[in-house]
């Protein structure tokens, strides 16, 4: 079950297509946009308080882009930050599962992170913002994920840029950011790319241990949105022996439709030992890998 970068992209595309709508209609993008002088953001100004604030859109540098936000998902991280500010980011414009259309580009930007040609009017999603200065960035420039000081749009405390998260009308893409052209996908599918990529990465990490293959017994504990996507990714990779555990019958039934072989409601068992015995029963005494 060897998986390279191209096959990962195909898997994500297949999973997203099965979970959402089709591709976006092929509409020629205009090359010029009317950009307002000011725009609004949803600023988390204190715990449990979001204010709509308006700021002047700054000039875009040669290595920057201005993106008109078309939509953004709400992640559990956004909820945690809204309730308790565990990362100490306030004031902050949240939103990291977003996508939008490029309306202005600096002269030095011609391609996305994978090398695809880029122009005004293209739709993109963002990933991390490597610092470009730590040891990992300087010695392993092709491994942006290892940056020791990586930033993420939607988790950047308020600064002079102002438009730092997808919970706003516009987003400014900074120099050194990772971003990807996704013109061939509908908005709903684009908003699922980030969580789907997380799931693919998790499966890749599991595969690196040598414990997951086509005949593996896989256990997924919790089938909320991420767990359900993880189920879809594992199933797409050809694994059939999948057991899911959750306390919500509706979610368990949905998991069945997504390809789970066994479903277990943990509320039906008084303790962990009973639950473990049930898992072994449904896997023929083998347990899970």
Each language-model region and where it sits:
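Protein-protein interaction and targeting regions used for scaffolding, dimerization, and localization
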Residues: 1-35
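Phosphate-coordination loops involved in phosphoryl transfer and adenosine-cofactor binding
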Residues: 38, 212-217, 239, 288
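Short Gly/Pro-enriched turn/cap motifs at secondary-structure boundaries
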Residues: 45, 56-57, 89-95, 158-163, ...
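Glycine-rich beta-strand-centered segment in the early N-terminal region that forms part
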Residues: 56-72, 85-138, 183-185
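NAD(P)H dinucleotide-binding glycine-rich loop of Rossmann-like/cofactor-binding domains
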Residues: 112-113, 133-221
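Adenosine-nucleotide cofactor-binding segment
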Residues: 220-223, 235-289
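N-terminal Rossmann-fold NAD(P) dinucleotide-binding loop
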Residues: 227-228
């Amino acid at each position: 079950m060897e998986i390279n970068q191209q096959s990962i992209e195909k898997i994500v595309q297949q999973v997203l297509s099965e979970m959402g709508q089709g591709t976006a209609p092929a509409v020629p993008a205009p090359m010029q946009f009317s950009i307002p002088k000011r725009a609004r953001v949803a600023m988390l100004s204190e715990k449990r308080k979001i204010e709509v604030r308006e700021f002047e859109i700054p000039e875009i540098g040669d290595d920057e882009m201005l993106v008109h936000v078309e939509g953004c998902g709400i992640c559990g991280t956004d909820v945690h930050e809204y309730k308790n500010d565990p990362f100490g980011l306030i004031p902050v414009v949240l939103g990291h599962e977003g996508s939008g259309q490029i309306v202005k580009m600096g002269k030095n930007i011609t391609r996305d992170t994978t090398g695809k040609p880029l122009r005004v009017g293209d739709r993109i999603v963002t990933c991390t913002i490597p610092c470009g200065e730590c040891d990992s960035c300087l010695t392993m420039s092709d491994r942006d994920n290892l940056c020791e000081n990586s930033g993420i749009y939607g988790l950047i405390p308020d600064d002079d840029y102002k438009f730092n998260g997808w919970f706003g009308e516009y987003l400014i893409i900074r120099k050194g950011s990772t971003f990807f052209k996704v013109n061939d996908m509908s908005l709903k599918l684009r908003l699922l790319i980030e969580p789907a990529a997380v799931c693919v990465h998790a499966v890749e990490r599991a595969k690196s241990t040598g414990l997951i293959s086509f005949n593996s017994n896989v256990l997924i504990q919790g089938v909320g949105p991420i767990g359900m996507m993880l189920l879809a990714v594992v199933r797409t990779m050809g694994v059939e022996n999948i057991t899911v555990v959750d306390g919500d019958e509706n979610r368990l039934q949905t998991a069945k439709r997504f390809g789970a072989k066994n479903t277990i409601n943990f509320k039906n068992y008084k303790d962990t030992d009973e639950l473990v015995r049930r898992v072994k029963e449904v896997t023929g005494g083998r347990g899970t890998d």
